Amino acid sequence: MKTESYIYWCADDFGITAASCDRIAECAANGCLNKISVLPNSDVEDIAGRLKSILDIQKVTFCVHLNFVEGLCVSDKNDIPLLVDCGGSFKNSFTGLLKISLSKNRKALREQLKTEMKAQISRAAAFFPENEPLFIDSHQHTHMIPLIFSVLCEVIEE
């Protein structure tokens, strides 16, 4: 049985700035993209409207681009102190998350990641078309950290 292969031309970080949103939308309108990874914790104004305008132009698959290293958290900052500073901004790099995942704080990190992950997925899912598969990846590939991947699998199962 022969299966047809499909290549995704993906733009990451939709929502990192208004200008990048505009550029990504332009690429989608010109048929250069068929997948867009959206930062759920974006503070860009009217991100839902910007995404809808892309859907109106062309069929594009959207992806939740989980972010644990940049910007503000989506969940309550008091619930995830290993991830954010007192202002709610993420405070760890990829390496920092890896170090914590191997430390005595591993169990607490697992619970805090789960809290933030659920909040980000819930927020982003509201932007996307209903009854469509939900694709998930992560900013700076943090889902490749074994603990984060494990939490992601757990959240998906739930």
Task: List the model feature ranges, each with a label.
Residues 73-106:
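Active-site gating loops and adjacent loop-to-helix segments of metal-dependent hydrolytic enzymes
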Residues 2-18, 24:
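Boundary/entry segment of secreted carbohydrate-active catalytic domains
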Residues 24-30, 47-63, 82-88, 125-129, ...:
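Acidic (Asp/Glu)-rich catalytic clusters
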Residues 18-45:
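A short alpha/beta connector and helix-capping loop motif
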Residues 110, 118-158:
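Catalytic domains of cell-wall/extracellular-matrix polysaccharide-remodeling enzymes
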Residues 6-8, 33-37, 59-65, 133-137:
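Structural preference for beta-strand elements that scaffold enzyme active sites
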Residues 17-25, 116-123:
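Short, acidic/polar
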